[in-house]
Structure formats: C-alpha cells, structure tokens
Amino acid sequence: MASASGAMAKHEQILVLDPPTDLKFKGPFTDVVTTNLKLRNPSDRKVCFKVKTTAPRRYCVRPNSGIIDPGSTVTVSVMLQPFDYDPNEKSKHKFMVQTIFAPPNTSDMEAVWKEAKPDELMDSKLRCVFEMPNENDKLNDMEPSKAVPLNASKQDGPMPKPHSVSLNDTETRKLMEECKRLQGEMMKLSEENRHLRDEGLRLRKVAHSDKPGSTSTASFRDNVTSPLPSLLVVIAAIFIGFFLGKFIL
C-alpha cells in the first residue's frame, strides 16, 4: 500500500522540453559546441527549475537554474567543452531537468530546494548525442556562403547603369540642340559667303568696265574679301566637329 501511494504521489514533469529526450552536439569538437534546450511552462503557476549533468567538468550551462512564469519559455544554453572525439566511444553523459512548483513569496532558491519533499519534485532525463558531420554536410554548409556573394555581385553589378543612362540622355539632348544651332549658324554663314562671292564678282565686273588698268587693284580687293567667309566656314566646321566628337564619345 505504501509503495502504491508513493507511486501515485509522484508528479509528472510539468514543463515541456524541446528537445524532449536527446541533446545533440554536432562536431567538429575542436571548439566549444553549443546546443539549446527550451523549457516551456504551460501551467498557471510559477515553476522553479535546475539543470544537472553527470559530467559537470565537460559542460557549461546557462542558466542552470531559475523560475519560469506561467505560459513563459526559458532557453538554456548547454556548451560542450572541446575534446578529442573518438567515434568508437559512445557518450554516457546525461542531463536531468528537475522542477518544483514555486511557493508563494519565493526569495531564497536554495532554501526552496533544500526544503522540497521528494514527492514534490518533478524530473526529466536527457542523454547527450555526439554527431560528426560528413563530407556532404560540409559541402552543403559551404555552398550557401559561396552563393551569397555571387548572387550579390550579379545583382549589384548592373545597378549603376540606369543612372549613367539618364545622364547620357540629358547630355545627348543638349548636344543635339547645340548641333542644330550650329547647323543654323553654318547655313547663315554659307548664305553670307554666297552673297559676298556674288558681290565680289559684281565689283570685279564694275572695275573692269570702268577702269581697265585697275586689274591689280580689283584682284587685290577680291583676295582680301574672299578669305573672310572661308575662314568663318572653317571656324563653324571646327565647332561642329568638336561637339559631334563629344556626342560620339
């Protein structure tokens, strides 16, 4: 009867553990390896907890004790210290999560655990599992890190182009307007050149008809007036060539 009543008095674990049974540590184990244990309190009462291990020198647990409010979750970080991994050696390390409902006005946690009765305690046990990554896992871990900069470079490469295109369009419009203006000036200069040439011919005819002996003077006059429009045409051509060259570049 006593054993039956003792068994009935044993409380089931009130917290929900994630993971529920195994704490998995993934190698290589040349550095500290951390795994997380989540403790969720689904009840409407505060719950005190503490985490124990069979190998306290091999692990660092933060936090290793505390109080969980109703409906809250606490994440416990379990840190495995570096060691020489032997695949033929099976891990015998275990953890235990021990809990008790927090009494009213809890202030001294040590006193709570010391004064706790065995039938008030709830516990869950977890075993430690060591996993060594294979070559495929290593390649899979490396591929995403390589893919990120490649995708980023493809996306980032063409980004400046729209800005440069808009600048070229604006510059093109300005150059086209300038070319049209210079073409108009060139047409005016050609018209003036034609007019001056006709005027020169008329003057030569008048000079020949009035004074036959003054051929040298008329020739001199023609040589002075003719280069002027030609020079203007050359200057206009230089300006047009300059702006067209800028447009092409």
Curated annotation (Swiss-Prot):
N6-acetyllysine PTM positions read K125
Q: Where is the composition biased (Basic and acidic residues)?
A: 135-144
Where is the segment annotated Disordered? 135-167
- Give the GO cellular component terms, alphabetically: azurophil granule membrane; bicellular tight junction; cytosol; endoplasmic reticulum; endoplasmic reticulum membrane; Golgi membrane; microtubule cytoskeleton; nuclear membrane
As for family, the record states: Belongs to the VAMP-associated protein (VAP) (TC 9.B.17) family.
Sequence segments annotated as region (phosphorylated FFAT motif binding): 50-53
Alphabetized GO MF terms: cadherin binding; FFAT motif binding; microtubule binding; protein domain specific binding; protein heterodimerization activity; protein homodimerization activity; protein-membrane adaptor activity
Presence of the UniProt keyword NAD in the record: no
| PANTHER family assigned to the protein according to its UniProt record, in alphabetical order | VESICLE-ASSOCIATED MEMBRANE PROTEIN-ASSOCIATED PROTEIN, VESICLE-ASSOCIATED MEMBRANE PROTEIN-ASSOCIATED PROTEIN A
| Repressor keyword on record | no
Instruction: List, for all copies, the residue spans of the domain called MSP.
Output: 14-131
Q: Kindly list the positions at which Phosphoserine occurs in this protein.
A: S166, S214, S216, S219
From the record, give the transmembrane residue ranges: 228-248
The record places the following residue ranges in the Cytoplasmic compartment, namely: 2-227
Q: What is this protein called?
A: Vesicle-associated membrane protein-associated protein A
Subcellular localization, as worded in the UniProt entry = Endoplasmic reticulum membrane; Cell membrane; Cell junction, Tight junction; Nucleus membrane
For this UniProt record, the keywords arranged alphabetically read as follows: Acetylation, Cell junction, Cell membrane, Coiled coil, Disulfide bond, Endoplasmic reticulum, Host-virus interaction, Membrane, Nucleus, Phosphoprotein, Tight junction, Transmembrane, Transmembrane helix
Function per UniProt: Endoplasmic reticulum (ER)-anchored protein that mediates the formation of contact sites between the ER and endosomes via interaction with FFAT motif-containing proteins such as STARD3 or WDR44. STARD3-VAPA interaction enables cholesterol transfer from the ER to endosomes. Via interaction with WDR44 participates in neosynthesized protein export. In addition, recruited to the plasma membrane through OSBPL3 binding. The OSBPL3-VAPA complex stimulates RRAS signaling which in turn attenuates integrin beta-1 (ITGB1) activation at the cell surface. With OSBPL3, may regulate ER morphology.
Write out the coiled-coil annotation as residue ranges.
Answer: 169-205
One Gene Ontology biological process: cholesterol transport
**Which of the residues bear the PTM N-acetylalanine?**
A2
Whichever gene encodes this chain, its name is VAPA
Q: In which tissues is it expressed?
A: Ubiquitous.
* Domain characteristics, as noted in the entry: The MSP domain binds the FFAT motif of many proteins.
